[in-house]
């Protein structure tokens, strides 16, 4: 089957924003104008297409990144039909993993900002994630119809808070209840959309006289920005003191794709104004898979040399699995992005990360939670597969004869844990199954058994994250459970190097005995980076090679539950350099236990400490409560990083606060500010816990 849409007419984009910036409403308007939906869905009445989970409809927030495909030929039908694959991502910081894995497979992002609230905390988090993957982006300043809307103030805030050159390609005509349309600064025309057909039709007008001077100023600004794209455009600009429309677009596109600028549009999705022009901007200024840097420079699995793959159907097949989702009818759905080549249902491919083959069963095109079965997918496509058995998020799928490993994703470590106890024997059986399925979907969610208390402990990125998991367990899997209080996920490590610690396991009781003897050094590694390092320095065969992996395994088992208080051990290196063995009695088990004893003894001598998670907290508060808020942060062992004015005359306070001090903060903040302040927090790093915390935790173990 030949390709229907040329790859240059593809746009793989994400829609991302702070919570409540109007992101899902904007996506719903995109689906309406592109003909996917024939009626408008609203978030406030729970009818949004992309928010299909019950939890999303109840809370009015987006939890999972829903995917859909649509087509657009321009407001004035001026383009060939372009295929737009859209991923709508969450705005709540507890679901950062959903944003992260979407960013990994996208070519461009639309960042949505509220015309009243401006750049809010989660906007900065998402911006950093887009920077990490070098994704070109354009901004849509939404809610221009709301009281307090100020387009140019938000433009300025984007420049100052996100450290980027912001280039408006539109101006708003009026604001608040007088918002009527936009000025297109490239064409130098005003655009107004019809209120009789929900904005499907539009007309160009002359720019209103009261806006003409401002429009000329910003038009010249974008001409200068476009001219700086290359020498040829700069020559034209210097010769004519202006550029033609097509040259402006070439220059702006070039600089946007190089991440030198962010182009800014505006509108009101709710009032059906501006989303249509945003769609045109997506086609004109965001990259196709051919333009995207991610299509080349991956690592060949076998020889670790750089290998190139381009977004081309003729190249060997390569794809990245970026999300696993449970489906009540078909089991696991594996969402994947094809970078090169073609794959058809029934094809056998290599999972190059796990080094085993997989057969593609059915391939489906997703629209939120609806599916359409298709026979094949090609370079640039985003689809879901049914029937892949052992694929996890971040795995590379590729041609069996041309192995390649694509750039992996980084997943954050969970920072908060709670105990869950099933209420009945039947619940107990179902709970293990349901939690494992949910953990397979979400790499930032972990499940473990505490062997001392025999409790099931679940860990995640925040209280809301775990609340949603428990809610899904109850609704989707019908599991009833008692929930414990949130616990901080501490870590254990050491400060000093300790050498020549011996560990022995000897058992002689008639017949064949057990004998293992190891001598190790342990040493600290750089914090928050390295995890664990095992160095085998055995010389002269004092311990046979077949026992080395058992020694490593014995140490790694101890890392899962540290000697201090049973928390995971991190940032530690172990050097094995001596020991002895017995010809008859030595075994893998004996060396594993000997290593375990040696590690425990060495750890206790190496000045062990507890590490606690530190959160980056941002509080937005009216100025009159600022003193109370800062005082409260200080009482919670917080360190104030800085303060800036926010868009609505208040203060935005940034601080570093230990997670253990943040439980119940939402309630305390509401009461201190009469409900007028809000906050967000995200994990920053682990640092040494104070002695008082250390003593209270270690003494209870």
From Swiss-Prot:
Any Gene Ontology CC annotation: cytoplasm
Recorded GO MF terms: GTP binding; GTPase activity; guanosine tetraphosphate binding; translation elongation factor activity
tr-type G domain ranges (all copies): 8-290
One GO biological process term: ribosome disassembly
UniProtKB keywords: Cytoplasm, Elongation factor, GTP-binding, Nucleotide-binding, Protein biosynthesis
Classification via InterPro entries: EFG_II, EFG_III, EFG_III/V, EFG_IV, EFG_V, EFG_V-like, EFTu-like_2, G_TR_CS
Annotated compartments: Cytoplasm
Keyword flag Protein biosynthesis: yes
Sites where the protein binds GTP: 17-24, 88-92, 142-145
Main function: Catalyzes the GTP-dependent ribosomal translocation step during translation elongation. During this step, the ribosome changes from the pre-translocational (PRE) to the post-translocational (POST) state as the newly formed A-site-bound peptidyl-tRNA and P-site-bound deacylated tRNA move to the P and E sites, respectively. Catalyzes the coordinated movement of the two tRNA molecules, the mRNA and conformational changes in the ribosome.
Protein family: Belongs to the TRAFAC class translation factor GTPase superfamily. Classic translation factor GTPase family. EF-G/EF-2 subfamily.
The protein's name: Elongation factor G
Organism: Buchnera aphidicola subsp. Cinara cedri (strain Cc)
Classification of source organism: Bacteria, Pseudomonadati, Pseudomonadota, Gammaproteobacteria, Enterobacterales
């Amino acid at each position: 089957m030949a390709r229907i849409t040329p790859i240059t007419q593809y746009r793989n984009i994400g829609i991302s924003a702070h919570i409540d910036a109007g992101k899902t409403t904007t996506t719903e308007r995109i689906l309406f104008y592109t003909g996917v939906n024939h009626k408008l869905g609203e978030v406030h009445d729970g009818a949004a297409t992309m928010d299909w989970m019950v939890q999303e409809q109840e809370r009015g927030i987006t939890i999972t990144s829903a995917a859909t495909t649509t087509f657009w030929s321009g407001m004035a039908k001026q383009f060939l039909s372009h295929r737009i694959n859209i991923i709508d991502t969450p705005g709540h910081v507890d679901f950062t993993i959903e944003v992260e894995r979407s960013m990994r497979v996208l070519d461009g992002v639309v960042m949505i900002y509220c015309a009243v609230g401006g750049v809010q905390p989660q906007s900065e988090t998402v911006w950093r994630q887009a920077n990490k993957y070098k994704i070109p982006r354009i901004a849509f300043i939404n809610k221009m119809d709301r009281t307090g809307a100020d387009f140019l103030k938000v433009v300025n805030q984007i420049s100052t808070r996100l450290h980027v050159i912001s280039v408006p390609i539109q101006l708003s005509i009026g604001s608040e209840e007088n918002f009527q349309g936009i000025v297109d600064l490239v064409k130098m025309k005003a655009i107004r959309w019809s209120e009789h057909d929900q904005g499907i039709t539009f007309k160009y007008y002359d720019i209103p006289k009261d806006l003409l001077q401002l429009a000329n100023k910003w038009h010249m600004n974008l001409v200068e920005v476009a001219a700086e794209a290359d020498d040829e455009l700069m020559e034209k600009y210097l010769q004519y003191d202006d550029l033609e429309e097509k040259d402006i677009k070439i220059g702006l596109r070039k600089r946007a794709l190089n991440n030198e600028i962010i182009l800014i549009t505006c509108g009101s999705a709710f009032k059906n104004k501006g989303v249509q022009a945003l769609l045109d901007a997506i086609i004109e200024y965001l990259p196709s898979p051919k333009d995207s840097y991610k299509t080349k420079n991956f690592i060949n699995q076998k020889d670790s040399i750089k290998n190139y793959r381009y977004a081309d159907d003729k190249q060997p097949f390569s794809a990245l699995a970026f999300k696993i989702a449970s489906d009540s009818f078909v089991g696991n759905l594996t969402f994947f992005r094809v970078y090169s080549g073609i794959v058809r249902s029934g094809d056998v491919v290599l999972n190059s990360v796990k080094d085993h083959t997989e057969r593609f069963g059915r391939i489906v095109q997703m629209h939120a939670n609806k599916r359409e079965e298709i026979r094949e997918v090609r370079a640039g496509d985003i689809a879901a597969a049914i029937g892949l058995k052992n694929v996890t998020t971040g795995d590379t799928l590729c041609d069996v004869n041309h192995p390649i490993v694509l750039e992996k994703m980084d997943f954050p470590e969970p920072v908060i844990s709670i105990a869950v106890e099933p209420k009945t024997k039947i619940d107990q059986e179902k709970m293990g199954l349901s939690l494992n399925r949910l953990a397979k979907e979400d790499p930032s969610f972990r499940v473990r058994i505490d062997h001392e208390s025999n409790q099931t402990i679940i860990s995640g990125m925040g209280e809301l994250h775990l609340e949603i998991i428990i809610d899904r367990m109850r609704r989707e899997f019908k599991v009833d459970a008692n929930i414990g209080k949130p616990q901080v996920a501490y870590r254990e490590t050491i400060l000093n190097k300790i050498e020549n610690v011996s560990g022995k396991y000897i058992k002689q009781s008639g017949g064949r005995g057990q004998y293992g003897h190891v001598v190790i050094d342990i040493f600290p590694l750089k914090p928050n980076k390295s995890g664990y390092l095992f160095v085998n320095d055995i010389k002269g065969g004092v311990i046979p090679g077949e026992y080395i992996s058992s020694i490593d395994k014995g140490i790694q088992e101890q890392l899962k539950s540290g000697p201090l208080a049973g928390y995971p051990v991190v940032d530690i290196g172990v050097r094995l350099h001596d020991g002895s063995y017995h010809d008859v009695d030595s075994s893998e088990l004996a060396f594993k236990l000997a290593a375990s004893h040696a590690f425990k003894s060495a750890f206790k001598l190496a000045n062990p400490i507890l590490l606690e998670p530190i959160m980056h907290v941002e509080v937005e508060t009216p100025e009159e409560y600022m003193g109370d808020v800062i005082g409260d942060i200080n009482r919670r062992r917080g360190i104030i990083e800085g303060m800036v004015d926010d868009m609505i005359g208040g203060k935005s306070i940034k601080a570093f606060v230990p997670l253990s001090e943040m439980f119940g903060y939402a309630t305390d903040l509401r009461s201190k500010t009469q409900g007028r302040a809000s906050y967000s927090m995200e994990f920053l790093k682990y640092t040494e816990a104070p002695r008082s915390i250390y003593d209270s935790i270690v003494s209870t173990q």
